[in-house]
């Protein structure tokens, strides 16, 4: 039985208990959230020794790290190195977005080397193999696509991004809309290109029940991809984006009826003043399904710093109710990310997630900041480093300049904490 089916039967599974313990909540809270469809636990029934992760309403905001090869660059060793870095700095899940050679070997190596939930975009495998087999991606068959989905489910993939909402009607809306950046989702482009070439409906939509059968058998969580997400802020919240979202709302209902866990992906590039509205719209249309956002990026003019533009948008989105942040790295729009980019991307998104969790009232979030404030007042550097999101970087920065006393090298003899104690009678308890 799937986690959703067991939740509806009132069965608290070991996975629900583990997530409850991590979140500091009662197992019954997790059970109800899964039964209602506003919490998911991505866990393929074939995966063992997984570090379980709950995503959704009332839980801490989670962070995903994308890794994977491109057609020109990448190797098993480099992707495993990125994987280990993402794990080390606190990613909650991993997605393999490989499109290069040895795509199956890469995915299997990632599965063998991680205890985190793994997600994929199966159309990438189907497209790569169709190009090799038939000479063109668009010549893949529906069976090729569903074959890729099922083979990955058998391997143990925990969640899959599928662009089911890119329908013929939605494509007509997109064509009538007019956009600056057209379609920027690779999976969305592959799907739309296939539909135009064959003059046919999206097989993931037309045969959605077949997809549900696979996911139900292996308890793979569906992540309904936003193939028409805006690729620039000028395209944000347009008719094409909303038309696809309406379809995804229908598919959320069908997935729940089939007792398959489901979450929904979202934009993309969105200006600050539209982010909250986007979250509210998704939550309404998709009946409070967990919301998984890429960023969103709040400006288009910061290549090299898009981990920052994404963290700004991610903090606002998560504070408004988004549940799951897909990290953005400094390499976004420029190149394949390297291991340093992965580190910076995860940390930036974790900062955004934590900032939002304070607003959400997530269990323990504000208390960590309170403990940091106490440690700072005491000039207790070890506790400050321990509480920081990136202790290694904080320690290196702290140690760049050696000081005579306990104050940092910025203030020295003019430390505000020490002066307050000396002249205002505000006690600073020394560590």
From Swiss-Prot:
It comes from the Bacteria. Substrate binds at residues 66, 95, 124, 163, 185-187, 226-229, 265, 292. Keywords: 4Fe-4S, Iron, Iron-sulfur, Lyase, Metal-binding, S-adenosyl-L-methionine, Thiamine biosynthesis, Zinc. Its cofactor is [4Fe-4S] cluster. Zn(2+) binds at residues 269, 333. Binds 1 [4Fe-4S] cluster per subunit. The cluster is coordinated with 3 cysteines and an exchangeable S-adenosyl-L-methionine. Its EC number is 4.1.99.17. InterPro entries: ThiC (IPR037509), ThiC/Bza_core_dom (IPR038521), ThiC/BzaA/B (IPR002817). Transmembrane segments: none annotated. One of its GO terms (molecular function) is carbon-carbon lyase activity. It catalyses: 5-amino-1-(5-phospho-beta-D-ribosyl)imidazole + S-adenosyl-L-methionine = 4-amino-2-methyl-5-(phosphooxymethyl)pyrimidine + CO + 5'-deoxyadenosine + formate + L-methionine + 3 H(+). Pathway: Cofactor biosynthesis; thiamine diphosphate biosynthesis. [4Fe-4S] cluster binds at residues 408, 411, 415. Pfam families: ThiC_Rad_SAM (PF01964). GO terms for biological process: thiamine biosynthetic process; thiamine diphosphate biosynthetic process. It is an enzyme of class 4 (lyase). Belongs to the ThiC family. Catalyzes the synthesis of the hydroxymethylpyrimidine phosphate (HMP-P) moiety of thiamine from aminoimidazole ribotide (AIR) in a radical S-adenosyl-L-methionine (SAM)-dependent reaction. This is Phosphomethylpyrimidine synthase. It comes from Dehalococcoides mccartyi (strain ATCC BAA-2100 / JCM 16839 / KCTC 5957 / BAV1). The gene is thiC.
């Amino acid at each position: 039985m799937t986690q959703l089916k067991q939740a509806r039967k009132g069965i608290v599974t070991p996975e629900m208990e583990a997530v409850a313990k991590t979140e500091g909540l009662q197992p019954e809270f997790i059970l109800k959230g899964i039964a209602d469809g506003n919490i998911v636990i991505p866990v393929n029934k074939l995966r063992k020794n997984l570090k379980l992760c709950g995503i959704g309403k009332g839980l801490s905001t989670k962070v995903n790290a994308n890794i994977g090869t491109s057609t020109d660059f990448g190797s098993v060793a480099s992707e495993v190195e990125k994987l280990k870095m993402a794990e080390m700095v606190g990613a909650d899940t991993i997605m393999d977005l490989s499109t290069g050679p040895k795509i199956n070997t890469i995915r299997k190596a990632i599965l063998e080397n991680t205890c985190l939930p793994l997600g994929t975009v199966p159309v990438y495998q189907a497209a790569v193999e169709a190009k090799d087999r038939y000479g063109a991606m668009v010549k893949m068959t529906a069976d090729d696509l569903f074959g890729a989905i099922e083979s990955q489910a058998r391997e143990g993939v925990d969640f899959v991004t599928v662009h089911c909402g890119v329908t013929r009607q939605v494509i007509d809306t997109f064509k009538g809309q007019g956009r600056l950046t057209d379609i920027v989702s690779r999976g969305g482009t592959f799907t739309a290109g296939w539909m135009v070439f064959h003059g046919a409906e999206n097989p993931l939509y037309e045969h959605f029940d077949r997809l549900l059968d696979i996911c139900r058998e292996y308890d793979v969580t569906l992540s309904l991809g936003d193939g028409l997400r805006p690729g620039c802020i000028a395209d944000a919240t347009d008719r094409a984006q909303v038309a696809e979202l309406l379809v995804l709302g229908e598919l959320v209902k069908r997935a729940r009826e089939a007792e398959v866990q489901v979450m929904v992906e979202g934009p993309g590039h969105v200006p600050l003043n539209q982010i909250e509205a986007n979250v509210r719209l998704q939550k309404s249309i998709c009946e409070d399904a967990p919301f998984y956002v890429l960023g969103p990026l709040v400006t288009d003019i910061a290549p090299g710093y898009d981990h920052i533009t994404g963290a700004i948008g991610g903090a606002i989105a998560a504070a408004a109710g988004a549940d799951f942040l897909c990290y953005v790295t400094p390499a976004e729009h420029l190149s394949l990310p390297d291991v340093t980019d992965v580190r910076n991307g995860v940390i930036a998104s974790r900062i955004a997630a934590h900032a939002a969790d304070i607003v959400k009232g997530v269990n323990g979030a504000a208390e960590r900041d309170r403990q940091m404030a106490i440690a700072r007042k005491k000039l207790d550097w070890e506790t400050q480093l321990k509480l920081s999101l990136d202790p290694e970087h904080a320690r290196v920065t702290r140690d760049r300049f050696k000081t005579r006393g306990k104050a940092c090298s910025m203030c020295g003899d003019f430390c505000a904490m020490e002066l307050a104690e000396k002249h205002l009678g505000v006690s600073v308890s020394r560590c």
